[in-house]
Amino acid sequence: NKINYNSKIIALLPGSRKQEIKKMLPTFDKISRNYSKYLFVIAGIKEIDKKFYLKFIKNKNIKLVFNQTYDILNNSFAAIVTSGTATLETALFGVPQIVCYKSNPISYFIAKKIIKLKYISLVNIIMNKKVVEEIIQGDFNVNKISNEINKILEGKLRANQIENYLKIEKKFTDE
């Protein structure tokens, strides 16, 4: 699948497990319909069949590309990322992002009781402050994500994320 890198790309990283993709991708698909000026590109992984992804994509303007995550990120203007190592990778590529996660409500409730974390994204955990917006569980909806994506497409929040990404890089290179 060829990507037009002259387009402004919003990378979609829906996760690496079928369960995550099933929960995340339908909402990512709906969001993409509100941003016709942008090309949305899903970073697919080879372990998951193309047909599985396509079940959740209704917008024909979304591209599905396999095994090119770094190439996609290197050419992206922004990203919507499922929480995990991809959030740190996205930051190291300097791409402003919104971090999302939605799990089974019971699993989430149990995890919340057992694990006392202030943040779910590696970017925020490493920086010990909110650098990227985290949208989880009940907040995970088209309106909330769209409001947040608008903030990183231009303006102070976009610049702030990029500035903090440089600090993350520095933390790794100084140690």
Enumerate the predicted regions with their spans.
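Nucleotide-activated sugar donor-binding and catalytic core shared by glycosyltransferases
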Residues: 1-175
